[in-house]
């Protein structure tokens, strides 16, 4: 595939006010995307955003660019990323555009695209947009300018879609659930979904102010929800990230349940209810314990590269339905076309209610191996992944853990980080080995 100038593993992302996340570039991006999509006969796209203060500015810039290309725009307002994917399909729009930097701090933002099937835009279309960005921005004649309008019932439509994915003959009336929306795009949606299905809902992270998204709350900061579940004597907790495509859960003891354990619970329930369809896709970061537990159930397991895009690609290749990253991107193609935190939570709650077991009980079949992920910020000229000392240390650790664990070293696709992951049977040993490699990565300039 050709080298990409702008699109990363999850669209275009960066610091607001610095290229490419500037009003000027984003307007030109809207125009370039509009030109490419117009060549496919497009007349309408949808734009949604999370709750970052910069979302208003970038939404206006995109709207102007698409209008200049002659494309009509439907403005969804604050909307979870999977909700934008769903509405893109139901509105028969040619594309859905998400303004979000997901789990990143408020001062970052990004743009990514969904196709008319609610999936991430094909590589060929992204590359065509990149090529168009190299051309001067123009404008269609006045009579052909695109129009923009607000989609006033967007949240209600998505709430009803989520509820339709929960069995109609059962209720959540016996459950008390803490829901943490990370002050993000699900703040006005997730609590209503679970409440309308009968649950008693305790909300946290549902007061966005433009700058508090993901701040000390949500799926990337679990201390608050763990404490709330225990204090309120709740049955469980559901934590979503800023754009709603990532989920973590908490059982009644405050124990944090990640994407590996969530997909295990869903796969087990599918097996028990006769809905098992193929295997499960994880990633290079998935805990070895998941692989072993699924093997015990005679469920196939395959690893993709890190990133929900790669999980989706491998699911399509194998014709399977279930995939997840341990970071909380959970995909169930029986229900959605992309990772969806609310839908994943409903899949788990289906298991809780149908099996009449607590979340604590449902996770007992999976024994997670101790795993440590060390993130090393990196801005040097040389690539640590090619450094001789780092590679020698990785080989040494792999030899030490032969048959008992593994080591993985990779670059983040969205931030200037080198991720060092070590997994093994003993946490003290894992910590020692991970820090040994991380210290060498820090020395690379």
UniProtKB/Swiss-Prot annotation:
Gene3D superfamilies: Alpha-D-Glucose-1,6-Bisphosphate, subunit A, domain 3, Alpha-D-phosphohexomutase, C-terminal domain
GO molecular function: magnesium ion binding; phosphoglucosamine mutase activity; phosphomannomutase activity
Keyword Cytoplasm: no
CDD domains: GlmM
Comment on bound cofactor: Binds 1 Mg(2+) ion per subunit.
PROSITE patterns (UniProt xref): PGM_PMM
GO CC annotation: cytosol
A Pfam family hit: PGM_PMM_IV
Matches recorded under NCBIfam families: glmM (TIGR01455), PRK10887.1 (NF008139)
Record's protein name: Phosphoglucosamine mutase
